[in-house]
């Protein structure tokens, strides 16, 4: 444990930030998994709906720096390609 006041404050702030980041990440994951599940089921309409729900959330998290912008683009591109294969 830190002895210096600023180090104690920093530890508290880091823990608070860690909880917020974990919460946002866990909020994002089900939207991605919902699209994958719809593709495995072969339901194009449900997959498209899941993609439309997932896209703004992934973009928002990338804009806030939670995930890298290339990772967001990769999620969207992979899901779009899989949806197009279902046609």
From Swiss-Prot:
Tell me yes or no: is Mitochondrion among this UniProt entry's keywords: no
Among InterPro entries, the record links this protein to: Ribosomal_bS20, Ribosomal_bS20_sf
Superkingdom of source: Bacteria
Gene name of the record: rpsT
Pfam families, alphabetically? Ribosomal_S20p
- The name under which this protein is listed is Small ribosomal subunit protein bS20
Q: Which family does it belong to?
A: Belongs to the bacterial ribosomal protein bS20 family.
Gene Ontology cellular-component terms for this entry are:
cytosol; small ribosomal subunit
Q: Which UniProt keywords apply?
A: Ribonucleoprotein, Ribosomal protein, RNA-binding, rRNA-binding
What is this protein's function? Binds directly to 16S ribosomal RNA.
Q: Recorded GO terms, molecular function? A: small ribosomal subunit rRNA binding; structural constituent of ribosome
NCBIfam families reported for this sequence: S20
Species for this entry: Shigella flexneri
Q: Name one GO biological process term.
A: translation
The answer to whether UniProt assigns keyword Ribosomal protein to this entry is yes
């Amino acid at each position: 444990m830190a002895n210096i006041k600023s180090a104690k404050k920093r530890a508290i702030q880091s823990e608070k930030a860690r909880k917020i980041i974990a919460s946002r990440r866990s909020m994002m994951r089900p939207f991605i998994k919902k699209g994958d599940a719809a593709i495995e089921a072969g339901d194009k309409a449900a997959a498209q709906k899941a993609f439309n729900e997932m896209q703004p959330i992934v973009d928002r998290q990338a804009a806030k720096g939670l995930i890298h912008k290339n990772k967001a683009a990769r999620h969207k591109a992979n899901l779009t390609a899989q949806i197009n294969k279902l046609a």
